[in-house]
Curated annotation (Swiss-Prot):
PANTHER family: HEAT SHOCK PROTEIN 90 FAMILY MEMBER. Molecular chaperone. Has ATPase activity. One of its GO terms (cellular component) is cytoplasm. Residues 566-645 are annotated as: C. It comes from Geotalea uraniireducens (strain Rf4). This is Chaperone protein HtpG. Residues 1-348 are annotated as: A. It holds the Pfam family HSP90. Keywords: ATP-binding, Chaperone, Cytoplasm, Nucleotide-binding, Stress response. Transmembrane segments: none annotated.
Length: 645
């Protein structure tokens, strides 16, 4: 293709503006990002070569070369990795090809980017860090296996870039940074050495650089010639140790080394919450270095979130997102697993079914959950910080991972009617403080704590002093389908089915009271049933309500209002179901309705009041009324009549 000029996507330009114009305190990260990208590119070509050796073109001298040129004022980062063709260059550099782009930009707005330059790498766009130190970037690349697929990309970060075909003898990518005048320190040998040592020492490929030294002149016999002066000699030196950190003994690794490796593989520059480093022996031999992050990634709940840890076989890279190694509810884990038992040519498809992978997964999950249980027991404050980030994801395991259900049910936490906002309790703690008269574990699901606190379904529980768990995560509706009991106590939703809260004596007294209410209000009760027969399954007097006039209750195994909302939000078909309308026989409204009914059973206002009762019950649970205009008209009329009295 001939040379053409194209515009960056809006989001890319916003990102470039952020990079170019923000005063970052640590500009060294640009080199870390580019070396990390080069390492990934070599990983990819090695993986592809397992099924197609021809793409290597005989070049297996894996390395990342740094070429500082003080005369030209440029620093080049060269790799012999997978390379890119024109289409891939435009997809990977001209655009941000991820559905999380908007979320990324929002995240930048929400954080103090002056103190968080590492955000760039966290979102997989580390290449743009080049513009922190360069006023022009030139990229020349050729896709492995296609000698005619070389292209040249160039930009000054001004909103556009040029791209054209070019010649390149070998596969891989050269990125040349034309350094700003005030950034020429990055051409200094010792500055480069210090950055590589600090950030990229563990990269498994040699990071090399030509180094020139003055050496004494030597004769043909190799002996130094006295008085012969010195000559310049240039040699290629390796700047990093390349020792895989996970193969080293824990006692040899500093906390700083663990943290730097975490940054390398995760692009998350906060410290990890926990580091799990161990070797497994027996039926399955492997080494694992697993990190539990401190904060959830912005795209954790997006479909294209990259999950899984890096898989190696005998230190040979296989894949960077092996989903088969961990269940979905642990998708936020980062790290490396290096197996001695898998074949080097294992395919991604085989990974899903391989018995060794399943053994590794079982081992990893057990180790991770044990670490979380230990943290919860020994440092509950730390665990709470973790749980506020990852609790909703961890809960998924209760529903899907039956083998580890017992461990997981000890890890999940909830707010409750007896905790302050932001404080949580475990099921174990809940059971320990249950009154002797309480036989079941009570909970209520909803969108938020504030909505649940005002629910009429809680009135009787407050009166009796029974604690109710607040379940405000959408996943909770699925959790309680699997977690039906705990420690011999059944979990019971306060807005479903019948409640058994009373002692035998209290029950007898309440039944007598309800029978009396039925006699007093049977006529109006039947009338309400008839008026609402198309909307509710039944109308009955309530044992839940002490202050409110009415509420809606689902059957024991029926859909409640919260579950219906969640299914609708997911564009799922919601099965048609009717709930029970419960009325409070002690509420003044029942007396008013009964009085009107006894005076004039044909009074047209009675039907309106029945509709208002139903609408009121919907509103108190946070559901919309079916006819808002009719509802507001009736309320306005009632207000006028009340004012006229």
């Amino acid at each position: 293709m001939t040379k053409s000029t194209k515009k960056f996507e809006t989001e890319v330009q916003q990102l470039l503006d952020l990079v170019i114009h923000s005063l970052y305190s640590n500009k060294d990260i640009f080199l870390r990002e580019l070396v990390s990208n080069a390492s990934d590119a070599i990983d990819k070509v090695k993986f592809e070569s397992h099924s197609n050796m021809d793409i290597l073109e005989g070049n297996t001298d894996w390395k990342i070369k740094l070429i500082p040129d003080k005369t030209a004022g440029t620093l080049t980062i060269r790799d012999n990795g997978i390379g890119m063709n024109v289409v891939e260059v435009e997809e990977n550099i001209g655009t941000i090809a991820r559905s999380g782009t908007r979320a990324f930009m929002e995240n930048l707005k929400d954080k103090n980017v002056q103190n968080n330059p590492e955000l760039i790498g966290q979102f997989g766009v580390g290449f743009y860090a080049s513009f922190m130190v360069a006023d022009k970037v030139t990229l020349i690349t050729r896709k492995a296996g296609d000698k005619n697929a070389a292209c040249r990309w160039e930009s000054t970060g001004d909103g556009s870039y040029t791209i054209e075909d070019c010649e390149k003898e070998t596969r891989g990518t050269d990125i040349t940074l034309h350094l700003k005048d005030e950034m020429k320190e990055y051409l200094d040998e010792w500055k480069i050495r210090s950055i590589i040592k600090k950030y990229s020492d563990y990269v498994q490929y040699p990071v090399v650089m030509d180094v020139t030294r003055d050496e004494p002149a030597k004769g043909v016999d190799g002996e130094v010639i006295e008085g012969g002066g010195t000559i310049e000699k240039t040699t290629e030196e390796t700047l990093n140790s390349m020792k895989a950190i996970w193969t080293r003994a824990k006692s040899e690794i500093s906390e700083e080394e663990y943290e730097e490796f975490y940054k390398h593989i995760s692009h998350d520059y906060d410290k990890p919450f926990r580091t799990i480093h161990y070797s497994a022996e027996g039926t399955s031999e492997f080494k694992a270095l697993i990190y539990i992050p401190s904060h959830k990634p912005f795209d954790l709940f997006m479909r294209d979130h990259k999950k899984g840890v890096h898989l190696y076989v005998k230190r040979v890279f296989i894949t960077d997102n092996c989903e088969a190694l961990l269940p979905d509810y642990l998708r936020f884990m980062k790290g490396v697993v290096d197996s001695s038992d898998l074949p080097l040519n294992v395919s991604r498809e085989i990974l899903q079914e391989d018995i060794q992978i399943k053994r590794i997964e079982k081992n990893l999950v057990g180790k991770i959950l044990s670490t979380l249980v230990e943290t919860k027991e020994k440092t509950p404050e730390d665990y709470l910080k973790f749980y506020k980030e990852f609790g909703p994801v961890l809960k998924e395991g209760v529903h899907f991972d039956h083998a580890n259900k017992e461990k997981l049910q000890e890890l999940i936490l909830f707010e409750s009617s007896k905790t302050e906002a932001g404080n949580y309790i475990s099921l174990k703690e809940y059971v320990a403080r249950m009154p002797e008269a309480q036989k079941e574990i009570y909970y209520i699901t909803g969108a938020s704590r504030s909505a649940l606190e005002n629910s009429p379904h809680l009135e009787i529980f407050r009166k009796k002093g029974f604690e109710v768990l607040y379940m405000t995560d959408p996943v909770d509706e699925w959790v309680v389908q699997s977690l039906t009991d705990y420690d011999g106590k059944k979990l019971h939703a306060v807005d479903r089915g019948d409640l058994e809260l009373d002692s035998a004596e209290e029950k007898k007294e309440k039944e007598a009271k309800q029978e009396e209410a039925k006699k007093q209000y049977q006529g109006v009760l039947d009338f309400v049933k008839e008026q609402l027969k198309d909307k509710v399954k039944e109308v009955r007097f309530s044992s839940r309500l002490t202050d409110s006039a009415c509420c809606l209750v689902a059957d024991e195994y029926g859909l409640n209002a919260n579950m219906e909302k969640i299914l609708k939000a997911m564009n799922q078909d919601v099965p048609e179901s009717k709930r029970v309308l419960e009325l409070n026989p002690d509420h003044p409204l029942m007396q008013v309705l009964s009085s009107i009914f006894e005076k004039d059973k044909e009074n047209p206002r009675l039907a309106d009041y029945c509709g208002l009762l139903y609408d009121q019950a919907l509103l108190t649970e946070g559901s919309p009324v079916p006819d808002p205009l009719r509802f507001t008209r009736l309320v306005a009329e009632l207000m006028v009549k009340a004012a006229e009295k």
